[in-house]
Amino acid sequence: MTEAFYTDKSRVRASFDRAAATYDRAAVLQREVCDRMATRLDLIRHAPARVLDAGSGTGYGAGLLRARYPEAQVTELDLAPSMLRASRDKQLPQGRLRRLFARAPALVCADLEQLPLASGSLDMVWSSLALQWLNTPDAVLAEFHRVLRVDGLLMFATLGPDTLKELRQAFAGIDGATHVNQFIDMHDMGDALVRAGFATPVMDVERIVLTYDEVKAVMRDLKAIGAHNATAGRGRGLMGRQAWQRIEAAYDRLRQDGRLPATYEVVYGHAWRPAARPRRKLDDGRDIIEFHPHAPA
């Protein structure tokens, strides 16, 4: 990833903080991806006692997890405190007295790359559309591996490089700034899982296309969910009218059946934390790597 595409984490936090009040009205894609992730759980045999929703937003995914695993402790973790407050307000009952005696949900405001959780303390980590806000997956996957117990499950969805390809195309050549975040390829994500020590990773990808009447509606939806451009190479000033008209004209050429497409490439994956293999060493400190060739047919 080039320096221009590095994500400014403080801007990510500020953007989602501002969007907390409008997020649920615009988060159509986010809810759909959570629902599809939950459907994938039907194919996995796992009964977790402690679950982390990593990048929980306003709590939609955590609600699905609590419904599926009613005996489990589900902890919501997000970088933006206003998102967590929105989730808390939805869960607590109305009325001051009832709230006083209600059980508060488990909420943690923290960075995914520095989880304030004990090693081996979780049976499952769920993360829906949060990993794309990180510069590389390695640090966060190492943290997920650390906090999971042996045989713990990691399940996630993130965005692939074809996401918002129409918007990227419309902005191409306007100026030297970056206007759309860069997203990691599915195969690179699978490689990162293996590097982090996860076993039997399963990956798949699908494309979800939302449609709009005009370019401004695309931008309004992105703003409403807090999905601002947070790259280091973003423009710092306001865009002029002529530049914006060129963007609208370029995007309008992509219109299909009277509607403007906005493509999201959604990458799904799950993997397990295996038991650590004992490492054998020679007297001089070199590792022993066992090799068992197959017998010839």
Curated annotation (Swiss-Prot):
Group of enzyme by EC: transferase
Pathway this chain belongs to: Cofactor biosynthesis; biotin biosynthesis
Function: Converts the free carboxyl group of a malonyl-thioester to its methyl ester by transfer of a methyl group from S-adenosyl-L-methionine (SAM). It allows to synthesize pimeloyl-ACP via the fatty acid synthetic pathway.
GO biological processes: biotin biosynthetic process; methylation
Lineage of the organism: Bacteria, Pseudomonadati, Pseudomonadota, Betaproteobacteria, Neisseriales
Keywords: Biotin biosynthesis, Methyltransferase, S-adenosyl-L-methionine, Transferase
Enzyme Commission identifier(s): 2.1.1.197
CDD domains: AdoMet_MTases
Provenance organism: Laribacter hongkongensis (strain HLHK9)
Name of a matching Pfam family: Methyltransf_11
Protein's name in the database: Malonyl-[acyl-carrier protein] O-methyltransferase
SUPFAM superfamilies: S-adenosyl-L-methionine-dependent methyltransferases
Superkingdom in the source lineage: Bacteria
Family: Belongs to the methyltransferase superfamily.
Aminoacyl-tRNA synthetase listed as a keyword: no
Primary gene name: bioC
HAMAP family, sorted: BioC
